[in-house]
A protein has these predicted regions:
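Short, extreme N-terminal segment that most often corresponds to the first beta-strand
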Residues: 1-29, 149
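Charged interaction segments
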Residues: 32-150
């Protein structure tokens, strides 16, 4: 079964009140919230779908980078991507700190877990950060937006 995600993650208090055209704040578990970056958002800002994992880019599009940097003025945020199908796939993450890029893009099967660790997520024994915040609840970005009423 396929899984795709393109989103901005952050502590709930950091992302609280964030408003981006075409998306809606989705509370997750462990004090984390998410701004899913679906089709409407990508079209509105002219950004590509999964630029790091699908398009093979080595840096974020400027529109997404600027939005993340602005959000990170209030605390750390992470831009994340995931693309899996049939047990094969990759994740990407970019951590933003104090209004700028903290780490270069990371492509790895656990890139989202590493970003969530940096955001302060401590999973219980036998779990990982991805599961601890509930990112497995939906299989793609548009489902997250539908569940949030966007």
């Amino acid at each position: 079964m396929a899984y795709t995600l393109q989103a901005i993650l952050g502590r709930s208090e950091v992302l609280y009140g964030a408003s981006l055209q075409g998306t809606k704040l989705v509370p997750l578990l462990s004090g984390v919230s998410m701004l899913p970056l679906g089709r409407a958002f990508l079209e509105a800002c002219g950004a590509p779908f999964l630029p790091l994992t699908d398009a093979g880019e080595t840096s974020l599009p400027s529109t997404i980078r600027e939005i993340c940097a602005q959000l990170a003025e209030g605390g750390d945020v992470a831009y994340v991507e995931a693309e899996f199908s049939g047990g094969e796939g990759i994740q990407a993450s970019v951590l933003f700190h104090r209004g700028g890029v903290h780490d270069p893009p990371r492509l790895a099967t656990n890139a989202i877990n590493i970003a969530l660790q940096a955001l302060g997520v401590n999973p219980p024994a036998g779990s990982d950060e991805f599961s601890a915040v509930g990112l497995g609840a939906h299989r793609d970005t548009e489902q997250w937006l539908s569940s949030a009423g966007a």
